[in-house]
């Protein structure tokens, strides 16, 4: 949880999210003045957000900054990505194999065995697919 005193300075300067990463700022208390920018740092739009008027998801690679906050601000930042990128972004595993991604729309879930799984990137992806997910046994040889 950030307060007016603990918001990192980098978020008050122009910055953008990484490719494939969405940001979501949740405001619990107070107000925050926020600007969307172009790549040159020119303000494209400015908004005031609060607990009643939450900021939208910030698109990947969108330039933005926190302009100012009220003294009582309490907020928290979370990052989101596509399921196939999660373990790559969070744990630096190699990306999910392209053939697994191509087959995903046709899979119904169930059980899977991943022999020679390495660090488990494909098994982890298949396991996280929710209702269509797999119970996966993974063995590296």
Describe every region a protein language model picked out:
Residues 110-116:
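Conserved class I S-adenosyl-L-methionine
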Residues 60-83:
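Ligand-binding loop in jelly-roll beta-barrel domains
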Residues 91-109:
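Conserved alpha-helix/loop element of class I SAM-dependent methyltransferases that forms part
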Residues 135-140:
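Conserved SAM-binding motif I beta-strand of class I
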Residues 119:
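Conserved SAM/SAH-binding loop
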Residues 2-19:
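Conserved short histidine dyad/triad with adjacent acidic residue
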Residues 40-60:
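Short acidic-glycine-tyrosine-enriched beta hairpin
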